[in-house]
């Protein structure tokens, strides 16, 4: 599934990994498979890992944007000018 321009390939050789879970978590995973949302526990875990990787990618992208903003220094425009520009970009003609 693409995320911020990053495409990961999931069709690779599979490795086996054993995971120990408390009973409550095991029951939760079994419930997810019994609901029909996932075919088996492995599919559920792979989906969790994909989502975690996508989340990490988004956080890294956001951090790059924050760093870029911090590195750009203090701007010369006033708060009023910044708000006016934001309203113009949003297509709003009046102050909120």
UniProtKB/Swiss-Prot annotation:
CDD domains: RHH_NikR_HicB-like. Disruption phenotype: Cannot be disrupted, suggesting it is a functional antitoxin. No visible phenotype when the parDE4 operon is deleted. Pfam families: ParD_antitoxin. One of its GO terms (biological process) is regulation of DNA-templated transcription. The keyword ATP-binding does not apply. Transmembrane segments: none annotated. Keywords: Toxin-antitoxin system. The keyword Cell division does not apply. InterPro entries: ParD, ParD_sf, Ribbon_hlx_hlx. This is Antitoxin ParD4. Belongs to the ParD antitoxin family. Antitoxin component of a type II toxin-antitoxin (TA) system. Neutralizes the effect of cognate toxin ParE4, but no other RelE or ParE toxin.
């Amino acid at each position: 599934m693409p995320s911020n321009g990053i495409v990961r390939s999931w069709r690779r050789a599979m490795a086996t990994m054993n995971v120990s879970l408390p009973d409550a978590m095991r029951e939760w995973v079994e419930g997810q498979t019994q609901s029909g949302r996932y075919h088996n526990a492995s599919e559920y875990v792979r989906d969790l890992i994909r989502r975690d990787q996508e989340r990490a990618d988004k956080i890294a992208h956001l951090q790059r944007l924050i760093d870029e903003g911090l590195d750009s220094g203090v701007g010369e425009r006033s708060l009023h000018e910044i708000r006016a520009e934001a309203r113009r970009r949003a297509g709003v003609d009046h102050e909120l």
